């Protein structure tokens, strides 16, 4: 399962390898998805919070929805995009809170492995270029997962990119 952290919108995506949800022994030794014929999409979407809610309520909503998703999909690995320190401090603080909620939710499932991936590494692994734009990332996700159309949500597409990248060797 890949997650693109956010409070207003948190993207998530679940992929499967060889009919097993990321059942590979070690995160460091995962196969390269561009050479992997059995990488398939299971599900993806976004957790959205109402902007009029106060932050504690938004965090609680994200937490509860994420718990439901983890229980439903039972991933063996949850991959999270690392903070990009070039963003402004208010955005970084909000994304940091979202990441904390993801880690807290994951802590309820001790057998679930956690991987944290840098945005630049994700882009370069999937497209060969670390400064790829959103459409380039969506195209890569579409190609790798053999989708008929691009994911509409940037957040869900980013989460799928994180999940795909987590299956690759030395992704971080």
Where does each model-flagged region fall?
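Phosphate- and other anionic-substrate recognition elements at nucleic-acid/protein interfaces
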Residues: 1-20, 28-172
């Amino acid at each position: 399962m890949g997650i693109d952290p956010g409070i207003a919108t948190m993207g998530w995506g679940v992929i499967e390898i060889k009919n097993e949800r990321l059942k590979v022994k070690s995160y460091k030794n995962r196969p390269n998805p561009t050479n992997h014929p059995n990488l398939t999409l299971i599900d993806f979407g976004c957790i959205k919070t109402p902007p009029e809610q106060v932050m504690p309520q938004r965090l609680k909503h994200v937490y509860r929805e994420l718990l439901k998703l983890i229980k439903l999909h039972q991933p063996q690995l949850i991959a999270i995009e690392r903070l990009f320190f070039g963003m402004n401090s208010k955005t970084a603080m909000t994304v940091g809170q979202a990441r904390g909620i993801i880690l807290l939710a994951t802590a309820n499932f001790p057998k679930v492995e956690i991987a944290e991936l840098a945005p630049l590494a994700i882009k370069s692994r999937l497209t060969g270029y670390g400064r790829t734009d959103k459409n380039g990332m969506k195209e890569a996700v579409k190609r790798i997962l053999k989708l008929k159309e691009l994911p509409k949500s940037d957040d869900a597409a980013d989460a799928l990119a994180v999940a795909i990248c987590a299956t690759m060797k030395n992704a971080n």
